[in-house]
Amino acid sequence: MKRKEADNWIMSYDKNNIFAKILRGEIPCKKIYEDEFVLAFYDVNPQKKIHALVIPKGEYVNLDDFASKASEKEIAGLIKGIGIVAKKLEVSEVVKGGGYRSLVNVGKNGGQEVVHLHFHIFGGEKVGKMVS
C-alpha cells in the first residue's frame, strides 16, 4: 500500500498477492468455474456453509479500480460469472437455491485484505444481517 494523505490509504496492485499466484497456477485452488474473464473457487477459510470467491483475471486492486479501468466486456464477464457461479453452487433463486449474498470489500475501511478485486459468494444457509 502507499500513503496518499494522513490516514487515507490507497492500495496499489501487488503482482505477488495470493490471487495473482492462484491465477498463475503457483498456488492451487478448488476451482468452481473459469472463463476468459473470471476464475471462481472455494474460499479456504469459509465463513458460511457455501463460501466462494469470484475474481477477475485482470490486475484490478478493487471495485473502484475495476470500474474505472476495465473494458465493457470484462465488466459484463464478471457480472455474468457471478451469476454462473451462483447457479453452479445451487444457491441462485433461478435453481431454487434459496438465495445468496454477493459481497465485495473495498479499501482499508471496507475490510479489504487482498489487493485483487474479489467477490465473495455466501449461501447454503441464511447469511444474516448485512452489517453488525
Question: Where do the protein language model's features map onto the residues?
Answer:
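HIT superfamily nucleotide-processing domains
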Residues: 1-132
